[in-house]
């Protein structure tokens, strides 16, 4: 299925029903006291995160959503029925923003998380509310309030443990194919990956992590060139970034060190927090090099890289097993630290109460 990661929709909550002005009519009393009921509340619109949905494709085809209007009030003190609420299901990881202001309204990061995005209007008042000692037969009633309406921007951030960075054709899709059951399109030309690919990497029966391959970056991606900038957002939730570098480019005039520096600079310009995430260097296609160990050492020295690095061949499977086990250990440790921090925060807030 094509991965749709953004959509713009309009939501219209239901208007409140109108109140009415009616009077009791009895056999010996042509016009008794007021008995006009209130209008019903308009239906509200909610969004709920659903792990069974993995794209925003439905919101590309249906863009306008209207909740039900509240019923008008009736005589005999009868209130109008409330409009039915509308629930829109979206993938876990969907960020909802007000299109007009850009303000983030909610981040639906957990399955079952539910939030109101447009509130239904209040019902109008019937004339029963306007009876007083000086006005025993009020003809006043009020209309229902309009429901809220918004144009919303939906943005899906892939929920992955590991994100892959790299120039087009660095071998990211091949790497995902090599270590997971995902089958992204692979070919020897840039921009093969046009949408984010997710792969589940299972190191044994009970341990796995999710890896995201996003479209290749080129210089200028942070300003919008190429395909990269609109997908960099998918890396924001990852626990680890892998920077894949093609050590054996088909075009011999290409300098892998220069390309690696360009990617690093794009990342820094796009988002400082993303730049500061844990990042490992993965040097790909070592099977195509003579004296690969020396070439790897020279590359690391020229780049001035101080962090962790791995030399692999995604196509031949060289070094992939060691890399995936190292990733698994990192993801598990990061998860443990996050849980401990969350527990400590919760305990601190409870003691503060």
From Swiss-Prot:
Coiled coil: none annotated. InterPro entries: G_OBG, GTP-bd, GTP-bd_Obg/CgtA, GTP1-OBG_CS, GTP1_OBG_dom, GTP1_OBG_dom_sf, OBG_GTPase, P-loop_NTPase. One of its GO terms (cellular component) is cytoplasm. One of its GO terms (biological process) is ribosome biogenesis. CDD domains: Obg (cd01898). It is found in: Cytoplasm. Disulfide bonds: none annotated. GO terms for molecular function: GTP binding; GTPase activity; magnesium ion binding. Its cofactor is Mg(2+). Residues 1-159 form the Obg domain. It holds the Pfam family GTP1_OBG. Mg(2+) binds at residues 173, 193. Residues 160-332 form the OBG-type G domain. GTP binds at residues 166-173, 191-195, 213-216, 284-287, 313-315. It is an enzyme of class 3 (hydrolase). Signal peptide: none annotated. Keywords: Cytoplasm, GTP-binding, Hydrolase, Magnesium, Metal-binding, Nucleotide-binding. Monomer. An essential GTPase which binds GTP, GDP and possibly (p)ppGpp with moderate affinity, with high nucleotide exchange rates and a fairly low GTP hydrolysis rate. Plays a role in control of the cell cycle, stress response, ribosome biogenesis and in those bacteria that undergo differentiation, in morphogenesis control. Belongs to the TRAFAC class OBG-HflX-like GTPase superfamily. OBG GTPase family. This is GTPase Obg. The gene is obg.
